[in-house]
Regions:
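N-terminal Rossmann-like NAD(P)+-binding domain of SDR-like oxidoreductases, especially those catalyzing
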Residues: 1-176
Length: 176
């Protein structure tokens, strides 16, 4: 959402797509949010009220190739849009549509399969939609970091103190 607001604020036409997988998975696993977070539609309305700028919202599953293709060929149905017409073929797609692989995928093989299916199919569907409809569209793909193995040390999580080549710092690992 912050990325969408950033580009909207800088004058770009923005469409955000979500299937609420993460929200639903948190509910399923009884690890709900720390505080209530508005839906994408609610956030888009609040954004427009405060800035006068529109962020279109489409709710759907990007593992469904036809839904993905609808975002490129004009068949998309927006859950929120001030002007309901097709936003047009995107110049840039920032692909965040991967679910965090761990710890969700480590629960059991079923959850691991859901993670793999989601993360591979979304990327595959995006590649074919761009190939078939929008070869000039640029893709920026951001995914989760997952590393597996048995190093001869603990795999730390949280704030780490580090000394390296005479410099010291503190940083959050594995995400910063």
């Amino acid at each position: 959402w912050p990325t969408a607001m950033y580009f909207s604020q800088h004058g770009y036409d923005v469409t955000v797509v979500d299937n609420y997988f993460r929200r639903d998975a948190c509910t399923e696993l009884d690890v709900g949010m720390l505080y209530p977070v508005p839906t994408l539609v609610e956030r888009a309305k609040i954004w427009q009220q405060h800035t006068g700028r529109e962020i279109k919202v489409a709710i759907g599953d990007l593992t469904d190739a036809e839904f993905m293709r609808s975002l490129f060929d004009g068949r998309v149905e927006y859950a929120w849009s001030d002007a309901m017409g097709f936003a047009g073929i995107p110049e840039i797609v920032i692909h965040y549509a991967e679910q965090p692989s761990a710890p969700y995928s480590l629960i059991n093989y079923k959850y691991a399969n859901v993670t793999l299916q989601n993360n591979l199919l979304v990327t595959n569907n995006l590649m074919f939609a761009v190939k078939d409809f929008a070869r000039d569209t640029h893709i920026i793909k951001l995914g989760t970091m997952g590393e597996y193995g048995t190093p001869n040390t603990d795999i730390e999580e949280g704030w780490l103190e580090i000394d390296h080549k005479g410099r010291s710092d503190r940083f959050l690992f594995p995400r910063q």
